[in-house]
């Protein structure tokens, strides 16, 4: 189901499973900010993606070659 969001675009729903510690931290953060849990997640996820747009960059990954199926570098 598509819904319009406050920013004027179409929004998508994403479900996640959180461990107890992460959930408790999120609840404390939303209580401090006065926002809903959903809005707190949206803001924090958007911020993370802006600050770390290339989280998996070429320093960590390399292109798959014909000889290898692995995309991870040996660390």
UniProtKB/Swiss-Prot annotation:
InterPro entries in UniProt: TraY
One Pfam family from the record: TraY
Molecular function via GO: DNA binding
Keyword set includes Metal-binding: no
Organism domain of life: Bacteria
Transcription keyword on record: yes
Keywords, ordered alphabetically: Activator, Conjugation, Cytoplasm, DNA-binding, Plasmid, Transcription, Transcription regulation
Main subcellular location: cytoplasm
Subcellular location: Cytoplasm
GO cellular component, one term: cytoplasm
Known function: Conjugative DNA transfer (CDT) is the unidirectional transfer of ssDNA plasmid from a donor to a recipient cell. It is the central mechanism by which antibiotic resistance and virulence factors are propagated in bacterial populations. Part of the relaxosome, which facilitates a site- and strand-specific cut in the origin of transfer by TraI, at the nic site. Relaxosome formation requires binding of IHF and TraY to the oriT region, which then facilitates binding of TraI. Also positively regulates tra gene expression.
Subunit details: Part of the relaxosome, a complex composed of plasmid encoded TraI, TraM, TraY and host-encoded IHF bound to the F plasmid origin of transfer (oriT). Interacts with TraM, probably through its C-terminus.
Family, as annotated: Belongs to the TraY family.
Protein name: Relaxosome protein TraY
